[in-house]
């Protein structure tokens, strides 16, 4: 199940990283560490001048692209944009491994894929996707795409060796990676929680930050209570002066925003309060 709407910033990035047209080019020289090329037409005649930035030359580590390419050599490269003066930019690394490129191009955003967790790190999770070329690890899950819940570390959700099913966000030919999402296959819990606005709930404080606290209201649902609400007339410079992590607190749900995945809270009114 896909998310009802994607963050516009993420969609902009996805649009920029979608595979471009592959062009046949001839290496004409080097400008610093960039590779200069000319486009070739169907009969091999040279056309527009283009540039392959150093970081788009190869996935292999070399001191200079001259170790990879020779002047006069013909290669394939993917269009990635335009440089100043409208010069065409290309990526040779996107075409470096034909088997990998074929695998990536067969995947579309929204496809459901399966794989095995290869590594769990504080910045995300690497996944061996079924069908990927031997010797590669193409799947990657960012921390925000693991779960709707707030977590301290990805190991709370997955472990190395676990089989998973996830949704493709984008298969990126330049990095050779497939960005995938576990949480996209699950309904946003805030969709069903939206009818709780105005209700008073009690839950444990799961995180304390300088400007307030996060309170667990239901499985995978956490709301934020600002320090000004928490203090309720008391003088406090930080939440730690008033409450601690794990402490239960009564709050009123004032806003549920599924688009931003945000729940705002206020202090629960005492009986008889105006």
For the regions a protein language model found, what residue spans apply to each?
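Single-stranded RNA-binding regions, centering on S1/OB-family and related RNA-binding modules
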Residues: 1-274
């Amino acid at each position: 199940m896909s998310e009802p709407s994607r963050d516009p910033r993420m969609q902009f990035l996805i649009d920029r990283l979608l595979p471009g047209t592959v062009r046949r080019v001839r290496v004409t020289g080097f400008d610093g560490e960039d590779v200069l090329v000319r486009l070739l037409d169907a009969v091999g005649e040279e056309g527009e001048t283009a540039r392959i930035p150093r970081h788009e030359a190869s996935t292999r580590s070399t001191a200079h692209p001259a170790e990879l390419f020779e002047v006069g050599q013909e290669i394939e490269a993917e269009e990635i944009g335009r440089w100043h003066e409208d010069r065409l930019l290309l990526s040779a690394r996107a075409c470096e491994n034909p088997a990998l490129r074929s695998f990536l191009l067969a995947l579309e955003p929204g496809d459901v894929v399966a794989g095995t967790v290869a590594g769990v790190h504080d910045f995300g999770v690497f996944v061996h996707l079924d069908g990927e070329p031997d010797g590669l690890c193409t799947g990657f899950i960012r921390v925000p795409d693991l779960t709707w819940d707030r977590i301290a570390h990805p190991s709370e959700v997955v472990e190395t060796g676990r089989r998973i099913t996830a949704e493709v966000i984008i298969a990126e030919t330049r990095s050779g990676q497939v960005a995938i999402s576990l949480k996209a296959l699950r309904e946003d819990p805030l969709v069903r929680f939206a009818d709780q606005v105005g209700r008073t709930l009690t839950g444990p404080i799961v995180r304390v930050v300088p400007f307030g606290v996060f309170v667990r209201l239901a499985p995978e649902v956490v709301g934020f209570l600002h320090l000004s609400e928490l203090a309720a007339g008391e003088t406090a410079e930080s939440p730690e002066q008033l409450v601690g992590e794990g402490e239960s607190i009564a709050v009123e749900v004032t806003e549920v925003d599924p688009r931003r995945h945000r729940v705002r809270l206020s202090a629960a009114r005492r009986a008889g309060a105006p």
